[in-house]
Amino acid sequence: MSMQDPIADMLTRIRNGQAANKVAISMPSSKLKVAIANVLAAEGYIESVKVLEGAKPELEITLKYFQGKPVVESIQRVSRPGLRIYKRKDELPKVMGGLGVAVVSTSKGVMTDRAARQAGLGGEIICYVA
């Protein structure tokens, strides 16, 4: 059976992996998933990202904890296949008053809301992370 929303599945695997105190999680890889994971790693929400090549590439994410607690407090899908959410540069949301990040897919690639605002770009709001 095909997966309807692979990005939501990725976010759920991260959420469940941290709830179970897993060191690392793996999932089927795609360019968008790797780009989202790289943004999360750059922002310090996950430890590392690795793509395991093969007939079906796997994405391995090493989760991050601080004093035994998960670094990611909440991770929430915003734009979904049934209802895409697009925002202009001046409409980009600030997650938790700037403490969290919104992951945005722009014409220049996947980036945080802060980076998109600086670059003067809008795009599809993929998820909120806090």
Curated annotation (Swiss-Prot):
GO cellular component: ribonucleoprotein complex; ribosome
Entry's Gene Ontology molecular function annotations: rRNA binding; structural constituent of ribosome
Superkingdom to which the source organism belongs: Bacteria
InterPro entries: Ribosomal_uS8, Ribosomal_uS8_CS, Ribosomal_uS8_sf
GO biological process: translation
Keywords: Ribonucleoprotein, Ribosomal protein, RNA-binding, rRNA-binding
Regions annotated as coiled coil: none
Short name of any one Pfam family annotated for the protein: Ribosomal_S8
Membrane-traversing stretches: none
Family, similarity comment: Belongs to the universal ribosomal protein uS8 family.
Function: One of the primary rRNA binding proteins, it binds directly to 16S rRNA central domain where it helps coordinate assembly of the platform of the 30S subunit.
Complexes and interactors: Part of the 30S ribosomal subunit. Contacts proteins S5 and S12.
PANTHER family from the UniProt entry: 40S RIBOSOMAL PROTEIN S15A
Descriptive protein name: Small ribosomal subunit protein uS8
Lineage per the UniProt record: Bacteria, Pseudomonadati, Pseudomonadota, Gammaproteobacteria, Pasteurellales
